């Protein structure tokens, strides 16, 4: 159990041309209101979380099929050795720039986006957890290039009853781009929706992915962040 609070502002038609401006802030603490508790004889801090983000997206720049977007944010995820899902306290400051395009071929349902993201992460925790999850590092820089190709023919984006959604996401982090987070990651996701009877819809899905570590450009130590691994 825990307590989470926050708020946000969303302007879906900012400046009257379909542009989207968003701001959000969330903060929470898990497992009660005290600052720490005892787990198997070990005093463990309760995980705290804080997230702030600001983003802007223009889906049709100058009435063309091009998309432009940018975002900045700060993310803090608390943890301890007893919290397997977040073993380290991690703080991340990031910024990203995105360009997208609606394709004419094979059909109008296809589109692609390309994003450059820069981030700096700081880790704190026991030395054993630092060695296990981040190779003993306490601070890392990451530069990523992300390509997403997708086809979306769903009749409704939130509660679809017919159609399909396909996406192929490719991430290249570090390597020739620099930084300590050096890996490639590929994820393919398929979803399709079939009406059955009355208002019931059958959703079928298939997801597969692979992640592989890459060498650092300067020969220094590198690793795959545990948030980007498959567990």
Positions of the model-derived regions?
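C-terminal outer-membrane beta-barrel translocator/porin domains of Gram-negative envelope proteins
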Residues: 1-3, 10, 129-231
């Amino acid at each position: 159990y825990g307590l989470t609070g926050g708020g946000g502002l969303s302007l879906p038609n900012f400046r009257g041309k379909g542009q989207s401006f968003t701001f959000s802030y969330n903060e929470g603490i898990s497992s009660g209101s005290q600052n720490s508790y005892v787990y198997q004889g070990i005093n463990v801090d309760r995980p705290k979380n804080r997230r702030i983000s600001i983003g802007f997206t223009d889906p049709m720049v100058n009435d063309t099929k091009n998309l432009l977007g940018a975002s900045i944010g700060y993310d803090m995820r608390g943890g301890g050795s007893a919290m397997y899902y977040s073993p380290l306290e991690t703080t991340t400051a990031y910024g990203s720039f995105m360009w997208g395009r609606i394709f004419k071929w094979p059909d109008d349902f296809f589109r692609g986006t390309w994003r450059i993201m820069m981030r700096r992460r700081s880790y704190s925790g026991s030395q054993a957890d630092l060695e296990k999850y981040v190779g003993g590092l306490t601070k890392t820089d990451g530069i990523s290039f992300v390509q997403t190709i997708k086809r979306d023919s769903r009749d409704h984006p939130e509660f679809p009853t017919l159609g399909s959604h396909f996406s192929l996401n490719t991430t290249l982090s570090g390597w020739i781009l620099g930084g300590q987070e050096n890996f490639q990651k590929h994820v393919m996701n398929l979803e399709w929706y079939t009406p059955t009877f009355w208002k019931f819809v059958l959703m079928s899905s298939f997801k597969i992915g692979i992640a592989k570590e890459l060498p650092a450009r300067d020969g220094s130590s590198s690793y795959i962040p545990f948030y980007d691994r498959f567990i």
